[in-house]
Swiss-Prot record:
<keyword id="KW-1015">Disulfide bond</keyword>
<dbReference type="GO" id="GO:0099106">
    <property type="term" value="F:ion channel regulator activity"/>
</dbReference>
<keyword id="KW-0800">Toxin</keyword>
<feature type="signal peptide">
    <location>
        <begin position="1"/>
        <end position="19"/>
    </location>
</feature>
<feature type="disulfide bond">
    <location>
        <begin position="32"/>
        <end position="54"/>
    </location>
</feature>
<keyword id="KW-0528">Neurotoxin</keyword>
<feature type="disulfide bond">
    <location>
        <begin position="25"/>
        <end position="45"/>
    </location>
</feature>
<keyword id="KW-0732">Signal</keyword>
<dbReference type="GO" id="GO:0090729">
    <property type="term" value="F:toxin activity"/>
</dbReference>
<feature type="disulfide bond">
    <location>
        <begin position="36"/>
        <end position="56"/>
    </location>
</feature>
<keyword id="KW-0872">Ion channel impairing toxin</keyword>
<protein>
    <recommendedName>
        <fullName>Putative neurotoxin-G</fullName>
    </recommendedName>
</protein>
<keyword id="KW-0964">Secreted</keyword>
<dbReference type="GO" id="GO:0005576">
    <property type="term" value="C:extracellular region"/>
</dbReference>
Length: 64
């Protein structure tokens, strides 16, 4: 019983996370870029049609 409740809770949490990522990656990913910019990172949307997951990555510029 405990395992079933745990799995259900994890599924509900993960579906909420994916819904938030879809919102961030709609409209060309501008919300993802803005969201990640708060942490001085670059927002990249990827997944099916480029709108399933917003990922914040650190941008390192090479110095010449």
């Amino acid at each position: 019983m405990f395992a079933m409740v745990t799995v259900t809770v994890l599924l509900l949490i993960s579906s909420g996370i994916f819904c938030e990522n879809e919102k961030l990656c709609s409209n060309g990913g501008t919300k993802c870029t803005h969201h990640c910019g708060k942490n001085n990172t670059v927002g990249i949307c990827h997944g099916q049609n480029g709108n399933l997951k917003c990922e914040c990555v650190e941008y390192k510029r090479k110095m010449f």
